[in-house]
């Protein structure tokens, strides 16, 4: 007879994990899920195993709003190795070409400027994007290259940090869907020497504060502390979570009377005085401004529910 699956906790919020190098985003997610004994968990945009930094992990009902973080801006610090190109565009791949580094600072400045603003980017074959239902990296590992369409991205800021010998360090603030490995590879080709990523750290996702990031080591230490003090781990771990509505905190708020919120919870659009004319809104209920979900402004001006928090249904 199979053993019944142990039920986890109904815990809701967002943990800003500082992902360590060498760990996949999914492995990091599973570790956090176990530490919190959470029923549900999901991350908001994978980091390569080589990369470190901010990986927001949504727990419970917060998973419904993870897409809004996938769509948000990101900020990275990257160090590129000049003179070498790899098949994956990072240090985890095989070197496929070596060339001398012979450009000038003026040439570097001009090359960097071409990557600022609205640009087109062809995703790497070593990415999780799909072609005919199969991930690109699965083709790449079989030595197969498939067509990829250039995608529109925005590089809001590309800051030169340092250039020492064969190392180039940059800070990049970019839109969703930007591959830093691809920017590095394309820059290396433009400079005529090739380049690949040897260090990558995600500094920020959306407007989340970097000082709220926590490591797996810190989480395990708190778990051990809870055991020593004979208290529930939740007492030490749960205060680290950002609110479940933090992925949508920048959307305009529409506050509803409880009786009106009742219609929204049943999936019905409602007319709200003073609501924005269009776009997404964050819906709250009553004087306590309890978060109940997000909605769209319909063509007729009503607030139509889009994603709702089930646990608040009566």
From Swiss-Prot:
UniProt KW keywords: Isomerase, tRNA processing
Protein name: tRNA pseudouridine synthase B
E.C. numbers: 5.4.99.25
Active-site residues, Swiss-Prot/TrEMBL: 48 (nucleophile)
InterPro entries assigned to the protein according to its UniProt record, in alphabetical order: PsdUridine_synth_cat_dom_sf, PsdUridine_synth_N, PUA-like_sf, PUA_sf, tRNA_psdUridine_synth_TruB, tRNA_sdUridine_synth_fam1_C, TruB_C
The organism's place on the tree of life at top rank: Bacteria
Annotated residues for binding of substrate: 43, 76, 179, 200
GO BP field: mRNA pseudouridine synthesis; tRNA pseudouridine synthesis
Class of this enzyme: isomerase
Source organism: Serratia proteamaculans (strain 568)
Encoding gene per record: truB
PANTHER family with a match to the protein in the record: PSEUDOURIDYLATE SYNTHASE TRUB1, TRNA-PSEUDOURIDINE SYNTHASE
């Amino acid at each position: 007879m199979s053993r019944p699956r142990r039920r986890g906790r109904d815990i809701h919020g967002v943990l800003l994990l500082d992902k360590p190098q060498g760990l996949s985003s999914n492995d990091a997610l599973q570790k956090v899920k176990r530490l919190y004994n959470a029923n549900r968990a999901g991350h908001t945009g994978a980091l390569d195993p080589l990369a470190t930094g901010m990986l927001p992990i949504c727990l419970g009902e917060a998973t419904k709003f993870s897409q809004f973080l996938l769509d948000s801006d990101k900020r990275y610090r990257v160090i590129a190795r000049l003179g070498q190109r790899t098949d994956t565009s990072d240090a985890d791949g095989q070197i496929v070409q070596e060339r001398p580094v012979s450009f000038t600072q003026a040439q570097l400045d001009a090359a960097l400027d071409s990557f600022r603003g609205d640009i087109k980017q062809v995703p790497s074959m070593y990415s999780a994007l799909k072609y005919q239902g199969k991930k690109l990296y699965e083709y790449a590992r079989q030595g197969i290259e498939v067509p990829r369409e250039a995608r529109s991205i925005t590089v809001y800021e590309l800051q030169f940090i340092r250039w020492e010998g064969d190392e180039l360090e940059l800070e990049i603030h970019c839109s969703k869907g930007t591959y830093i490995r691809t920017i590095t590879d394309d820059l290396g080709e433009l400079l005529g020497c090739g380049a690949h990523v040897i260090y990558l750290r995600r500094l920020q996702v959306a407007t989340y504060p970097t000082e709220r990031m926590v490591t797996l080591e810190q989480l395990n230490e708190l778990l051990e502390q809870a055991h020593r003090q004979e208290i529930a781990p939740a007492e030490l771990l749960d205060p680290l979570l950002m609110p479940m509505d933090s992925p949508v905190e920048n959307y305009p708020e529409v506050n509803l009377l409880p009786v009106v919120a009742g219609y929204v919870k049943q999936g019905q659009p409602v007319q709200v005085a003073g609501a924005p004319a269009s776009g997404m809104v964050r819906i709250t209920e009553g004087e306590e401004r309890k978060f109940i979900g997000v909605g769209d402004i319909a063509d007729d001006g009503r607030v139509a529910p889009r994603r709702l928090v089930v646990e608040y249904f009566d």
